[in-house]
Amino acid sequence: MSSGKITQIIGPVVDVEFGSDAKLPEINNALIVYKDVNGLKTKITLEVALELGDGAVRTIAMESTDGLTRGLEVLDTGKAVSVPVGEATLGRVFNVLGDVIDGGEEFAADAERNPIHKKAPTFDELSTANEVLVTGIKVVDLLAPYLKGGKVGLFGGAGVGKTVLIQELIHNIAQEHGGISVFTGVGERTREGNDLYWEMKESGVIEKTAMVFGQMNEPPGARMRVALTGLTIAEYFRDVQGQDVLLFIDNIFRFTQAGSEVSALLGRMPSAVGYQPTLATEMGQLQERITSTKKGSVTSIQAIYVPADDYTDPAPATAFAHLDATTNLERRLTQMGIYPAVDPLASSSRALTPEIVGEEHYEVAMEVQRVLQRYKELQDIIAILGMDELSDDEKILVGRARRIQFFLSQNFHVAEQFTGQPGSYVPIDKTVHDFKEILEGKYDEVPEDAFRGVGPIEDVLEKAKSMGY
């Protein structure tokens, strides 16, 4: 192990000098420095980001640099940060370095570990099969279905329900498919991570899930790399065990934000809106590793915070380019009490074609969108002149559109404790069948309110009966 000395510390960025004759560590190598706090030796990991010349490197700290001083000895490990992988990670919670943070026992020293930096699968390793991943959430399965091995973006501003939707997806995949999930918390609230952990523990889902956190209070180095840690764990299940894995990243915007913080400290010129000039490259390196291979698949569902609800911001716009499906959450729908607040017209998926979902599903989805689009166009007339100015056909269409809009809402298992209503999982065939009947006018006489927050159409009829219909 070659060793050097700290020459400069600027927040999370640490310069280390190895001397002009010494062997310099490679880019992305992990360096270790020990600091003494009240007589206790604490290990801090640094990652090499730049080679400055004259035997010096610039590194990013994965932990707080409080207590570090100039002149401290730094050791080169000779390899990248590596994290535990395999069955032992299930039910556990880690940080970016693969250290256990759930209070349980540490991993054995000889536990299998993989480096967090690796190349994306080659072209001939990729799988081209298109298969829909059934989520049991009506609005998603009908209008913007997810593909196995695809990338899904959950777009929405603050507080519209991205994290709750992710929790429900983890629940449904574990309960209905028995699949493995890896949850990666990137720069989000520690409280939410804690709540998610206990909720998953209570529901028994945790046994099929590995959790990795680099939350808001962590230095930017940890927030920038924690997504790679989660991805490395997911890749092992795909490549070695041949599994179909779900990778949840909450929130991909914080990944970009952390990169932006680090970029300025590394001395790079900022790009558009102050973001790092390497934004597209960093996003590409992460996203290209998330894919289906001939061995298995990693399907990723990424919550994407949209700053000030501006979709042209470079961070969400860069993420858009990599996605197969988008689920757009709309604040207007939360104000109407429709949960999940998924915008049925703005959400999209490349899986919504007759070749992938089938002719009937495609036609029902197109008709649902047509009815909702027409209703949207008529809303101005209704607001100014009232319903009486509409033709009889338009009145029928508005009634159906409102029933469809409410029927796209659904009670979630993970929200039972707040709503007092049991959650519902609706198979995709049932979803298509029920919406087809609504479009045919079979339920035109059923009160609109009966369609709110229910599962299949039978729940609507039961609710209507209890309302005295």
UniProtKB/Swiss-Prot annotation:
Source species: Lactococcus lactis subsp. lactis (strain IL1403)
Q: What is its main location?
A: membrane
Assembly state and interactors? F-type ATPases have 2 components, CF(1) - the catalytic core - and CF(0) - the membrane proton channel. CF(1) has five subunits: alpha(3), beta(3), gamma(1), delta(1), epsilon(1). CF(0) has three main subunits: a(1), b(2) and c(9-12). The alpha and beta chains form an alternating ring which encloses part of the gamma chain. CF(1) is attached to CF(0) by a central stalk formed by the gamma and epsilon chains, while a peripheral stalk is formed by the delta and b chains.
The similarity comment for this entry is: Belongs to the ATPase alpha/beta chains family.
> Which positions are annotated as binding ATP?
156-163
Give the protein's recorded name.
ATP synthase subunit beta
Report if keyword Cell membrane is assigned.
yes
Q: Does the keyword Translocase apply?
A: yes
UniProt-listed HAMAP family: ATP_synth_beta_bact
Looking up PROSITE patterns in the UniProt record yields: ATPASE_ALPHA_BETA (PS00152)
Provide the catalytic activity annotation.
Answer: ATP + H2O + 4 H(+)(in) = ADP + phosphate + 5 H(+)(out)
Q: Which Gene3D superfamilies match?
A: 2.40.10.170, Bovine Mitochondrial F1-atpase, Atp Synthase Beta Chain, Chain D, domain 3, P-loop containing nucleotide triphosphate hydrolases
GO CC terms for this protein?
plasma membrane; proton-transporting ATP synthase complex
EC identifiers of the protein: 7.1.2.2
- Role, per record: Produces ATP from ADP in the presence of a proton gradient across the membrane. The catalytic sites are hosted primarily by the beta subunits.
Pfam families membership:
ATP-synt_ab, ATP-synt_ab_N, ATP-synt_VA_C
Keywords in alphabetical order, please. Answer: ATP synthesis, ATP-binding, Cell membrane, CF(1), Hydrogen ion transport, Ion transport, Membrane, Nucleotide-binding, Translocase, Transport
Topologically, how does it sit relative to the membrane? Answer: Peripheral membrane protein
This chain is encoded by the gene named atpD
Localization of this protein: Cell membrane
In terms of InterPro entries, this protein maps to: AAA+_ATPase (IPR003593), ATP-synt_VA_C (IPR055190), ATP_synth_F1_bsu (IPR005722), ATPase_a/bsu_AS (IPR020003), ATPase_alpha/beta_chains (IPR050053), ATPase_F1/V1/A1_a/bsu_N (IPR004100), ATPase_F1/V1/A1_a/bsu_N_sf (IPR036121), ATPase_F1/V1/A1_a/bsu_nucl-bd (IPR000194)
